[in-house]
Amino acid sequence: MAKKNINHLKHGKHSKFARFFVDKRSTRSVGGNIVLIIFLTLLALMFLFPIVFMFNNAFKPLHELLKFPPDTFVRNPTLDNFLDLSDMFSNSLVPLSRYIFNTFFIVIIGTAGQIVIASMAAYPLAKYEFYGNEFISKLIVMSLMFSTAVTAVPNYVIISKLSLIDTYWAIILPAFSSTLGLYLMKNFMSQVPSSIIESANIDGANEFTTLWRVVMPIVKPAWITFFILSFQSMWGVTGGNFIYSENLKTLSYTLGQIAKAGFWNVTGVDIARQGVVAAVSLIMFVFPVTIYIIIQNNVIETMTMSGMKE
């Protein structure tokens, strides 16, 4: 059957590109496959090298960190960098547990809010025709071209007028308006067959129930992918422009300040804190990557999902 389809593509009335693709695929040699595998392996190693280097740096003693040229792998692993970081927090007026609570509170509420709001906004845009639908969809695409730096000043003005400066909501509320999440959810919800929604309505389900009990399970790969993107974004938010009280600051902000202090002080480069900087980098990197590894299958499913047809 497959051979018949290939012959049909070769001799049928199809584009030159399709015939060229089939010819190349059917005549590709074993040597070509080996070259492709070698190329992809080298590409993977190139992306993996910075991660391996960062992991090893976190456990290097100071004399290995300052060695030039640097060694990729640690020779005398130590936990001194993490112990130094712990000592810095123990001498702080605010305990480490408070920074961790602030971070997870902001990340969890912000991420959940983005998914809920983006899904509820995307559903009518994807499944219902109304005046202005196309205009709103184009506006969403256009808004993706704007950097967050462009909206920094308007966000500050709005947050200030709402008297939310120096509160958790100064960071959480701006995150709720995620155009990327709205765009992603709309595209996937538009692939859900309308017959499924009509069947749910016939069975007596209202729009709210249809969205959360029928549509959301179908587009699970999409909102899990959005969850990862949102989590990574919220995890890296410092909130330094909106929060001034030390007991409300996030772990990301505090670790970032420690890293900056490790690079520079009044006299120049602060050599003594380079190990702490390496430990900070690893801590900020590990948790988002762990979340991604746990649910990576859903992300891959999102990338390979070809759509559904009635």
Question: Which residue stretches match the model-derived regions?
Answer:
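A hydrophobic, multi-pass inner-membrane permease signature
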Residues: 2-310
